[in-house]
Amino acid sequence: MAKRTKKVGITGKYGVRYGSSLRRQVKKLEVQQHARYDCSFCGKKTVRRGAAGIWSCHSCKKTVAGGAYTVSTAAAATVRSTIRRLRDMVEA
């Protein structure tokens, strides 16, 4: 099948509505939310978004909570590193 859009991608469904800058922002989010991600349990690239914040691996059937548009958010990464640092301080 021929490629239909070059610039607009997934936001071509909105046509000329809503303005180009808003469609560009939506494109970034929609590409992230429809992408497949690596599973932290089985290592396969089969994690898909089920609903806002719910991510399921279709290989090992694990379900994890994450961000609305990506599996892991920047805030979650900060929390994980802080917990790891505090755990190391307690153990040392």
From Swiss-Prot:
Entry keyword tRNA-binding: no
Protein name: Large ribosomal subunit protein eL43
A GO molecular-function descriptor: zinc ion binding
Gene name for this UniProt entry: RPL43
BP term (GO), one: translation
Family assignment from sequence similarity: Belongs to the eukaryotic ribosomal protein eL43 family.
Keyword Transferase among UniProt keywords: no
SUPFAM superfamilies: Zn-binding ribosomal proteins (SSF57829)
Classification of source organism: Eukaryota, Fungi, Dikarya, Ascomycota, Saccharomycotina
Keywords: Metal-binding, Ribonucleoprotein, Ribosomal protein, Zinc, Zinc-finger
C4-type zinc finger span: 39-60
UniProt GO cellular component terms: extracellular region; ribonucleoprotein complex; ribosome
Matches recorded under PANTHER family: 60S RIBOSOMAL PROTEIN L37A (PTHR48129), LARGE RIBOSOMAL SUBUNIT PROTEIN EL43 (PTHR48129:SF1)
Leader sequence residues: none
Pfam families documented for this protein: Ribosomal_L37ae
